[in-house]
């Protein structure tokens, strides 16, 4: 088993990773953001040298209309922890591949502010990591990658000295569940990076939406796009699947074939996450609250499937995801929720039977990101 400490140094250790957790009980002596601060301190996040370091806090701001996303108060607790140790935190996410309220940086910032995220409420700035149109990216080699050789990661994520994931743990219709690895891997991918993970092939033009503006032809470095009779078309013999045409199309006429298998999707997520965390100080926090059946990318959220469990933290994102999914599956389904009924002790597979969430954790473990073996320590 390969173990990585928070600085990325590798040791061959047959040991379980420590995952710390706290329930959601609170009283006049300590509110929940203060309890999260105590969790971070106890779990060792203060060991990281934050002095004069840029610290990216990766979270999901929530699609407008969705109410299951993490409240800004949680982000403020993390940002304050970093600032108190001399660091320079910022909240970040990358633009979405699909049409919605977060497909470019301006809409994304509007969505974040609509959902309560601002420097006033969180104590730090918001930076959309892959820029205005989702094409400000860095190609990062994936050590040991089988599916991805160079991950396309939002530049601001890679410019940060320290990386912290703050994850709302919930279900996901393709990955099975959305945990730390999903938040890091898919979330930190640029629009082209997201396409690479979701798509086994190359994009196509929905010609009924195309107006022949030519933006796609100008951005393509491989002469793979042509416009005839004011309609663009993509020559797949020339297309390399970089996704830049998707980013620049003002009409959202260039579409992805969402045709990657769920197992390969999960393995690509693991490889993208590896590219993000490899070789720098990282820490991971997941909140198992408001566990909705689907991703916070939806413009709505269904009722929570289980009772709220608590907050979890670890240097090991693999162990963290394993601990969180075990915690969810130990809970009874809430009456009337989507997971109600016989779940066979796997709520996420019950919700999304075609998914294969374990493949992500197994592949991340194989890549050396961490271990599924964990010691759960309650504070």
Task: Mark where each language-model region is.
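Extended, low-polarity segments enriched in aliphatic/aromatic residues
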Residues: 9-74, 81-93, 98-379
